[in-house]
Amino acid sequence: MTEFDNLTWLHGKPQGSGLLKANPEDFVVVEDLGFTPDGEGEHILLRILKNGCNTRFVADALAKFLKIHAREVSFAGQKDKHAVTEQWLCARVPGKEMPDFSAFQLEGCKVLEYARHKRKLRLGALKGNAFTLVLREISDRRDVETRLQAIRDGGVPNYFGAQRFGIGGSNLQGALRWAQSNAPVRDRNKRSFWLSAARSALFNQIVHQRLKKPDFNQVVDGDALQLAGRGSWFVATSEELPELQRRVDEKELMITASLPGSGEWGTQRAALAFEQDAIAQETVLQSLLLREKVEASRRAMLLYPQQLSWNWWDDVTVELRFWLPAGSFATSVVRGLINTMGDYAHIAE
């Protein structure tokens, strides 16, 4: 398995270094649900501003305040403790009376708005996230400027970030240990983290191998293509390749890579053979996913940051603003710009 730091760069390895997240205010994330609350229903959606609190901690505190079980509070995604984040939490509170959320007091946390909603907010049920990042101590402004323009036009590899694998790769190591034993994992969080790490590592490996090809973004027979911004895909046939290539070049369609697991991967013929060969050596992780019946899926190979803009505060400090679809990693964008000083595996997704 290729180490995360050695995965193929789309625009070559950055020439300079820089510091990501010198303080929480350097990493601002605002969730974009993609819908507005219904205004009625047994659930309450709350938009919360937090700094110095992780998502699970806030959810547990909210459950205690409402005198409900912790499982009755849900969220669309984990947000980092050491960042300034706006995210939505959902609490199941049947009844017409709205709780007085002005009485909810938690250091570093503020309820910005709330409304009733008919459905539970489930993990992954958001459109995307808007990011404002500040990179400091940049050693090569010219290289970063060139890379920003290249990323705006050509995107970055849609790798799962280092944080998916845990500090020091602990989640991936846990998956490997589990795969080599028959012992059940009863801790649901560990089980989820380890399976996600296993599948993410295999995806990264497939993308890494494809990006090594000069014609990596050339549609091949059997590729699984995705409409930009959509989750479903269809299979390319040899007769359609010229037209499909035009649509890929115009970013209307995205070439996807496999999230391996049980069931069909989605690709066929030449594309399927390539993906299978790319991870042929990773039999342990593949066997784990099959054993645990993790369903195979697809994910876009490239990531195009939307609304990307930047502002140089001085020659060594730049502020970035961009929007990413749910499930994508801001750190994968930063990876294409600078060699980051320090380990950012602790940054939540």
Curated annotation (Swiss-Prot):
Residues binding substrate, per UniProt: 27, 129, 329
Keywords for this protein: Isomerase, tRNA processing
PROSITE patterns for the chain: TRUD, UPF0024
Residue ranges occupied by any TRUD domain in the UniProt entry: 155-303
InterPro entries linked to this entry: PsdUridine_synth_cat_dom_sf, PsdUridine_synth_TruD, PsdUridine_synth_TruD_CS, PsdUridine_synth_TruD_insert, TruD_catalytic, TruD_insert_sf, TruD_pseudoU_synthase
A Gene Ontology cellular-component term: cytosol
Catalytic activity: uridine(13) in tRNA = pseudouridine(13) in tRNA
EC code(s) of this entry: 5.4.99.27
EC top class named in words: isomerase
GO molecular function terms attached to this record: RNA binding; tRNA pseudouridine(13) synthase activity
Highest taxon above the source species: Bacteria
Pfam families on file: TruD
Catalytic residue list: 80
Gene Ontology biological process terms, A to Z: tRNA pseudouridine synthesis
Family: Belongs to the pseudouridine synthase TruD family.
Function description: Responsible for synthesis of pseudouridine from uracil-13 in transfer RNAs.
The name this protein goes by in its record: tRNA pseudouridine synthase D
